[in-house]
Amino acid sequence: MEEESTSEILDGEIVGITFALASHHEICIQSISESAINHPSQLTNAFLGLPLEFGKCESCGATEPDKCEGHFGYIQLPVPIYHPAHVNELKQMLSLLCLKCLKIKKAKGTSGGLADRLLGVCCEEASQISIKDRASDGASYLELKLPSRSRLQPGCWNFLERYGYRYGSDYTRPLLAREVKEILRRIPEESRKKLTAKGHIPQEGYILEYLPVPPNCLSVPEASDGFSTMSVDPSRIELKDVLKKVIAIKSSRSGETNFESHKAEASEMFRVVDTYLQVRGTAKAARNIDMRYGVSKISDSSSSKAWTEKMRTLFIRKGSGFSSRSVITGDAYRHVNEVGIPIEIAQRITFEERVSVHNRGYLQKLVDDKLCLSYTQGSTTYSLRDGSKGHTELKPGQVVHRRVMDGDVVFINRPPTTHKHSLQALRVYVHEDNTVKINPLMCSPLSADFDGDCVHLFYPQSLSAKAEVMELFSVEKQLLSSHTGQLILQMGSDSLLSLRVMLERVFLDKATAQQLAMYGSLSLPPPALRKSSKSGPAWTVFQILQLAFPERLSCKGDRFLVDGSDLLKFDFGVDAMGSIINEIVTSIFLEKGPKETLGFFDSLQPLLMESLFAEGFSLSLEDLSMSRADMDVIHNLIIREISPMVSRLRLSYRDELQLENSIHKVKEVAANFMLKSYSIRNLIDIKSNSAITKLVQQTGFLGLQLSDKKKFYTKTLVEDMAIFCKRKYGRISSSGDFGIVKGCFFHGLDPYEEMAHSIAAREVIVRSSRGLAEPGTLFKNLMAVLRDIVITNDGTVRNTCSNSVIQFKYGVDSERGHQGLFEAGEPVGVLAATAMSNPAYKAVLDSSPNSNSSWELMKEVLLCKVNFQNTTNDRRVILYLNECHCGKRFCQENAACTVRNKLNKVSLKDTAVEFLVEYRKQPTISEIFGIDSCLHGHIHLNKTLLQDWNISMQDIHQKCEDVINSLGQKKKKKATDDFKRTSLSVSECCSFRDPCGSKGSDMPCLTFSYNATDPDLERTLDVLCNTVYPVLLEIVIKGDSRICSANIIWNSSDMTTWIRNRHASRRGEWVLDVTVEKSAVKQSGDAWRVVIDSCLSVLHLIDTKRSIPYSVKQVQELLGLSCAFEQAVQRLSASVRMVSKGVLKEHIILLANNMTCSGTMLGFNSGGYKALTRSLNIKAPFTEATLIAPRKCFEKAAEKCHTDSLSTVVGSCSWGKRVDVGTGSQFELLWNQKETGLDDKEETDVYSFLQMVISTTNADAFVSSPGFDVTEEEMAEWAESPERDSALGEPKFEDSADFQNLHDEGKPSGANWEKSSSWDNGCSGGSEWGVSKSTGGEANPESNWEKTTNVEKEDAWSSWNTRKDAQESSKSDSGGAWGIKTKDADADTTPNWETSPAPKDSIVPENNEPTSDVWGHKSVSDKSWDKKNWGTESAPAAWGSTDAAVWGSSDKKNSETESDAAAWGSRDKNNSDVGSGAGVLGPWNKKSSETESNGATWGSSDKTKSGAAAWNSWDKKNIETDSEPAAWGSQGKKNSETESGPAAWGAWDKKKSETEPGPAGWGMGDKKNSETELGPAAMGNWDKKKSDTKSGPAAWGSTDAAAWGSSDKNNSETESDAAAWGSRNKKTSEIESGAGAWGSWGQPSPTAEDKDTNEDDRNPWVSLKETKSREKDDKERSQWGNPAKKFPSSGGWSNGGGADWKGNRNHTPRPPRSEDNLAPMFTATRQRLDSFTSEEQELLSDVEPVMRTLRKIMHPSAYPDGDPISDDDKTFVLEKILNFHPQKETKLGSGVDFITVDKHTIFSDSRCFFVVSTDGAKQDFSYRKSLNNYLMKKYPDRAEEFIDKYFTKPRPSGNRDRNNQDATPPGEEQSQPPNQSIGNGGDDFQTQTQSQSPSQTRAQSPSQAQAQSPSQTQSQSQSQSQSQSQSQSQSQSQSQSQSQSQSQSQSPSQTQTQSPSQTQAQAQSPSSQSPSQTQT
């Protein structure tokens, strides 16, 4: 039966508590009675539970108070009323509703037009109504109000009749609670959802109809007469008033109530209920209850307090039923982990033991010996005390309550418990004395001594409690301090004294040695002296001391050596004794463990005590007496050292510190005199500051006793004492009036000194009580915020409430080896809180200036406010000064004075000496001034000061005139007319002076007069003296009026504002502490802006890289959160060091991390806690109630219906849940990795993700500051750039590994053509196109041609498809631009492309390219690649000349130009069939020109005989070209079996186009029938993923031709002959290129000496240099658009010296961002995930993981060329790839031996898979074919469309397509071939082109590629010059608009202008260049 009944009861667990307002139904069902209480006598009814005056509970029948939980009742109110606590919330919620239709009000329109009036409101009559909360006679209610300006319509309130009453004919109308109740009931569900989304939840409880009556047990007992058992509760009196009012209202009614009577009843009811709830919600009534009831409190133990005692025991008291409290004394002979308990306590407190078959005999013996008090059987307890009858036989299952015995575990605590070690688990021994005894070594962790301190002892009962106590509180588990990491047990003064005395004896006789050896852990060794002349054998002190060592101990230190437990070396110095013992103990702990360490203490402590008791020690008054000569020396020191400073004591806080240091020096001198005494030297720890202070006070002097700063007594008391001192001593004492006491206790104090000392002593007493309020509040706040911060099992530090990561690792950088201190589950938040509060308490308890400043610094950081407060610290700025290397002395001091003089404001009153008014006769005045004034004011100024400050009288006159004139123009000022009539003048030498003085004759003078309309002299005199003169005195004549003060201070490394100078190491330096006037600061950041603005003229003296605002919050505003974090850590560390020996850095870092984890600096106060919980989305009302008023907290939670998940420590403990800390922390076992998604091998870069979601709202927050542009250059240099490791070539940041150059899968380096180069992208000039430097060169897998820019403010240099036309030109540099001669090692073979300056009218297109050098002038009439022209139409001999026609040369007469190398996109104005002009990459869908060519045709396409597909034939579908030499843009042949043909420069979207390679197309190699994964990336194979560009023979850019982008290599390991134009970065840097490659636009060229540091720069167009051949690199050329620099332009947050693309400088505080890190949004083939349909998602999920794994396997970093892949990868490739290949059997051959990834035999810049058969045969195979075949078989109906979409290169965006269509000539569509798919691999490549002769396929020799005659050059130049004029005329309009943007965006150094004549000359005279300069 029992089993059945128990099985029916299901286990439950509280998972959360939801708060809400109690509804009427809930109040009724909680009541024990179904009927309401309607008589006052029922308020103390027996149905409401115990306690009662007599009888039992009528509801549950209980008779004992602790058995009855109490029962509720309720009072029914006669009229509904508003809940007094929620009227405001109800008002806010109803304000959102239309009171007629109860829908959410629509937001008001901004235009205010007719449409808004008609459509903007739902109900016209209710739209104008507003709701206000009113209060009258103590009653609150809601009131409806119409606008007073509106016309009052009759019946405007009639719509409210549906809710209650039709009432009201005025502009206002009360809204009754009854009506609101009906409104809340009728709110539709849709409106409820919208209100809930806005944070307002409609609840029935907003209206009160039923008032709960609490149980009897919840009455707060405030008074008792000693007899009655019912407690008197003031809230019960108020509740009776409520009930009386209810009865009165009900009895007064007659019939139905109308609106007015309803309103009156509700107001009366509201008042009494509100009063009741106010009293009910407070712990004590405001008035004196004892006097009110005439009852005095009598202490009794009656049952009336049973419930109260229970509540206090459970929730308030630290004591419990199993605890005791007693005074402690010391016993050095007991073990450290033992505690002695008096037998009286041990007999009364019991431990529970359950009887079992195993312990029955043991417990029976205890019962028989009368050691048990009682036993329990079932629910009955039986006593076993003396006198009980009979013999008790124990049975299994009974519970025995035995007394405390020796060996029991208890834990001890001494309040206040401010740190972990205040709780210590100890073993019990029972003794006969009356105090609790502990080992003196335990005083340190308990912060106790033996002067009467009391401790609490707790006796854990259950087995789990005992186990927890031993694991958490045992001494051996707590030997290391959680605060400092040092040992918590320290030898006391008596032990050290005994040790010093022992060491002086050297030898011990036999009796002494044997007596002391009894306490050692080892046996007594043989004596050192067998026999002496005077005595027997003798042992050395070392032999006795080493008896305490563990066996076989070996350790050493600087001052001791122990080997084999033999003490071989020991420093006898008195001062070193304590530290040596600590070092030995630490060594034992590290070598032997905590158990042996405790054993050492247990042996050494009694041994030393025994020695001291036997030897004895004495101290006499003679030891404290100093000679008169020594006293005179000390007094003279006081007069010489201290007296000169006391006069300045009250000037600044730093003077106090200097005074304290001076007193400390004098103390040291006095202590040295005193330590001559042998006894004092042994007794005193001379390294202890407190010990020395006490000794000096006894025999030397008391020092500073009174101070007017940071004390609890007032400044008036100090001044009164000073007056008393002067009156008593006159001028004898120069320091006594400042609180310096020269006397000492030994010689006695005089009355004044005694008075000063008593004030100081009393202040210490007050400080220890009242002063602890502030640090106590800080400790409470720290605990509230940090209580839930623990280390989780994964090593991260998290907040258990929200599972938010606060810190990724804890203590990883610790050099002290404290990792063992903090394991998983450790509540490190609590440890950090206690570690910080301990120094805070110390700082407040100690009243020294040092401690005061420490506490102030702690508060500045830990209690920083959420919002800007405009305090003094918020307005302070610390200015550092620049280094001066001139070699002169005092440069920094002079600079500091210069800046201070510039900032410090000097008002006229600072220089004024005297003020005189002169009366002159009328004619004299008129002659001089031309006015009618008789009175003339003179302000005489200090000439010396004016000269020192370099202020002229003219400056003074001008400033005074300005102020007087401005005051005279103000309106509504009484004195305005007076200032208008005031005249000013100045003179260097005043003629009017005081007759009594002669020195005033040469005084500068400011003269002013008042031109009165009436001759009233009194009125004139009053205006001069009381109106004009005060204003003149306040006028600032020098400096900045916005600056309050500017002080030069000494800043050292131990100061909180220290910023290290990386270029100079010094102990300190002079800085300026500037404070801004409060009136000048309106918002956060103003102080910094004002100071920088004031310092513009001296900014060259200021180190802006290190200058910071003083406030941590302001540091965050200016420099960002990371800088604020570092400052918080630094300042907290400095403040702690002032008062404590040190706190572990882990604690301070955790504090700072918790303050900044929300994204802003939040202090440990209520505001910071609220902001933190909001940011982390934590709803924890119970925890919040510990920090904020609990009632308000719960009311707010009820309004918002918050749910406390009880995941916090407070919530868990409150509801009996296990807390998630320590071993109780939760974890889960994951059995299946696939279900949890942990089998995904792909790693996600957290920084990429953060950059993807980064906000740009504060993008331009820094531009608004005055003077910002001036400091940009300084700040740009300050930006942290990576420092490259010379060995590895990788960028290294000093403080993080955030920016690692990892080209992960999905993010390879590539050309980022579409990147926005704006601030918001975080890009800077030194990095790739649009690649954020922080990504270390990571780029998109494909070129982002179609990607729209993320930021529309400014477009990138090459944003070919951006939405805005960029209007800012790029910097046109003189070296390395297109067409500018570059330098190479082989200068003779380097072509010179159009070396010419930029023309003045050069057109800068929207993509910001260099204009004068870029293939001639660009035609930007269509403004982008989307339109007809890209670049220029023609250029004069651009890039040299070719055989027949140069690029862009256009034959106007013949559209069919025959040439060996057709013009590069040559264009004829009259024939659209001719290709585009030079550089006109033009219409993407444009029909190819019918140009016949024999050579490589750049950009020309021929339907019959063409070099290749034109450069601009980007979207041709199937151009059947018959090419002789492969053109630059040639396309693959139709239906070729290629995986990827040689991608032409623009062949983007071709679907199996036909291409026939000719000899030496740009970037093309010979195509043979071989299988490659990727073809050669010719001319910018823009969409290939890992294209390793290697040109074929004589390709464009080959080293033989000294092409762009390649450097001449002498190394045999060079991987490419030439990096083709646009060859993208390989991940392993396999392509080598020169620095001058076409495309390294924004990067400076490294010099030879910078080769190691710069060669790893990732550039999208310039192929990378190879690491292994870097030492053989030739001199590199200047890059395109940038002059060569001598420093690397590495990635980072600054420009690194490279020119930015728009002339903007790098703004350091911005975090970098890049769109390249959006890899999770794209597939492995760079297609957008959202572009696939739901049906295609199945195919995508099938093929995408395979593709990503393949990318990783084929990555060069995975397997070097030719290496076999691993077995796992081999299995993957065989099963997933080769198994589906259409030619599987052929590829497998005789069997697979292994699979490799290697370079293709033909296309050596491509990597592909090779299968090596067992017979040694090696064949390549294509994964594309395999995947296509697999998809076609598995999804035959969907595969083809999916393959086209998945493997297709990114297409242009819609805008581009539309523009292309517009640009297509008529008839173009008809000529376009149909779409055909094309492969994307290098496998089974079969060319279907016509056969070519060897001469056609043979590569051209260098001479063929270069040799040209001057005549050819001349003819080409002429043809180009003809088209040049057309190009200029077309682009003229554009140049005008762009010239404005140039002037705005570029600095003068970046803008180079040329005259039109220069431009024309360039266009017409290209023939003047040498042939070598015009070769291609």
Curated annotation (Swiss-Prot):
Tissue expression as described in the entry: Mostly expressed in flowers, and, to a lower extent, in leaves. Present in sperm cells.
Subcellular location(s) per record: Nucleus, Nucleolus
Annotated region (18 X 2 AA repeats of [WG]-[GW] repeats), positions in chain: 1215-1693
First and last residues of every Sequence repeat: 1215-1216, 1329-1330, 1378-1379, 1415-1416, 1430-1431, 1439-1440, 1447-1448, 1464-1465, 1498-1499, 1528-1529, 1545-1546, 1562-1563, 1596-1597, 1604-1605, 1621-1622, 1638-1639, 1641-1642, 1680-1681, 1692-1693
Catalytic activity entry: RNA(n) + a ribonucleoside 5'-triphosphate = RNA(n+1) + diphosphate
Span list, region Bridging helix: 751-763
Nucleus keyword on record: yes
Record: residues binding Mg(2+): 449, 451, 453
BP term (GO), one: DNA-templated transcription
Residues that coordinate or bind Zn(2+) 2: 98, 101
Annotated stretches, region: Disordered: 1272-1291, 1298-1718, 1847-1976
First-tier enzyme category under EC: transferase
EC number: 2.7.7.6
Biased composition (Basic and acidic residues): 1281-1291, 1298-1307, 1349-1371, 1415-1430, 1648-1678
Residues annotated to bind Zn(2+) 1: 57, 60, 68, 71
Full protein name: DNA-directed RNA polymerase V subunit 1
